Amino acid sequence: MKQKIVVQLSAFILFLALLPFTGIGQTKNVISTHRVFPKIDKIAEFEKAVANHAQKYHAGDNHWRVFAIQSGPDLGGYHITEGPKSWESEDARGDISPEHQNDWNKNVAIYLTEKQSGGYSVYQESLSTIALGDFTDKIQITHVYPKPGQGDNVVAILKKIKKAWEASGVTVAVYASSSSGPTQYTLTTRYKQGLKERAAGFRKPFKEVYETANGEGSFEQYLKDVAEYVQESWSELLFMRKDLSSK
């Protein structure tokens, strides 16, 4: 009887020890993105087809949020995000179903140009000022590309910027690219109060807030660090299209 209790206790302890690893493995902090560009004369047909596709085949971990790109080099394109999900669920996703893939190929892709891009990103909680799932309809995405070998230094820059965001109430979700071209951090500003947050005077100047959060003279060092460690950065505005997204 005593031996049986010891065996059961050992098994229970092993179960508890494995729980943290199970939790880590199932963290839903991954999103996949797909940018597509419809033919100029087929926009209405594309929108109808992509809405039907999203609402029929994309739910749960495969939920779609579809954005219209309003500015920047990809103006006129559509930015599709899938997730959040875990790597495990992405591993099991496959093509979702033969019907799903057939619908995309025959009913959606026929309206697209050859231009497209896509990738994976992982949400960085330690660099963000808003929860992963706290979405908004209007966003700005800033794409930041570190110089080769300078990723850690760019993260250090972002940690200081986060202090300024927190001080001024700016809500930003930060993602790191994963196996998707050059190393990139995407800073997604989620406008909780709409585009009026962009207006001059809505918040204190960034330089003032940054120096309050990081110390007098810190903004000058920030500019030097950006010049030294960042290869390139650019921004764009995107508007959510609920009518084209998953329900």
Task: For the regions a language model picked out, list residue spans one by one.
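Bacterial Sec-dependent N-terminal signal peptides
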Residues: M1-K28
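Short S/T/G/P-rich N-terminal loop/turn motif that feeds into the first structured element of a domain
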Residues: I24-K247
